[in-house]
Structure formats: structure tokens, C-alpha cells
């Protein structure tokens, strides 16, 4: 099956949802659609660069694909921040939608291209790919949010976060293509679960007395 046919099958319902929804629902679908489109375009560019420089499959997966794919996630998100200036509470969710659109198309295409070796390997790969893209999205969105108010940190942080996400992606691809592929799929899952546990243990929505930010003691009297 052609990659373009698969893209149209997956993206068409999302395009219909974009036309029907409004406000936050529409915005989430926009980013999901952008993620799938970015995945398709990144495949074209990765294949072109690999052919241009006669790179083998390993070099393409470890040295070319991470840069191209993270670029297609990072640049639209950066433009979104600079031009539309969204509310801070929207940013992480929007980046997640972009990453999940990317991961969804990548998973389906890999299944069509390589077939399946059983439900467990397919499930492990699906969770691993999804977690890897979500971890990279979290790194970028949370990192930029924490440094956005300072111009110098914003400039340096943008470069640093992009390179870190590329390195994480490259290590994942390297392990997945080795005989330790299961370790490659487990690393982003463990990373994601660890981050969720740390966030839940800190209870960011409350202060030391259990009050929400901006809530006075008098209101609880």
C-alpha cells in the first residue's frame, strides 16, 4: 500500500472533525492533523537525504531520521508559540496532540510496511513509539515553558532542547534496530512513567497546606 493512500485514509476523518469542531476541540484536531502530515513529509525528506548521500538503513535511522522528524515536530510548535502566543495551559496539550499524530501515522505505516510478528511485539512497538514521541514532546514543551520569559534562555534553550530530543530519538532508533529492541521500546515507557510519578508526587496544584494557588486562608476558615 502506498504511504500517501494510508495518509489520506487516516487524515480524512480528522479533516472532517476540524471542519465540524470549534475552539479547543478544533485546535487539538489541527495539531493531530499536523503531526500526521509532518510524519509523511519527514519520510520523504529522510528518504531523499539517505539516497542523496548513499546512506544505509542504520545511518538513515540513527543520523538522519531523528533530525528530520524532530524538526518537523519542533518547528511548527515554535512558530505556533511565536505567532499565536497561546495560553500556557494549552501548550503542553497541543504539543502532545502533534506528537500523537506523528506517532499514530508512524505506527500504522510500520505495521503495513513490515507486517506483524504477533500481538505482543506490535503492542510493545506501538507503546514504545508513542511514548518516545510523547517524551520528546514533553521535553520540548515543558522546557520551553520554563525558559520562555528570559530571552537568552529562550534562544539557548531552543537549541539545547532540540538537540536533546534528537539525541533521545537517535538512541531509541539505535536500540530498536539492534538485538536489544525490547530495551529500546521500554526506555521511553519507563521515562514517561517516571515523569508522571514525579509530577503526581509533587502535587503542583497545591501549596504546602494543600491550598490551591491564589486561594486565601480565609476562604477555608
Feature annotation, model-predicted:
Residues 1-221:
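Hydrophobic alpha-helical segments at protein termini of multi-pass membrane proteins
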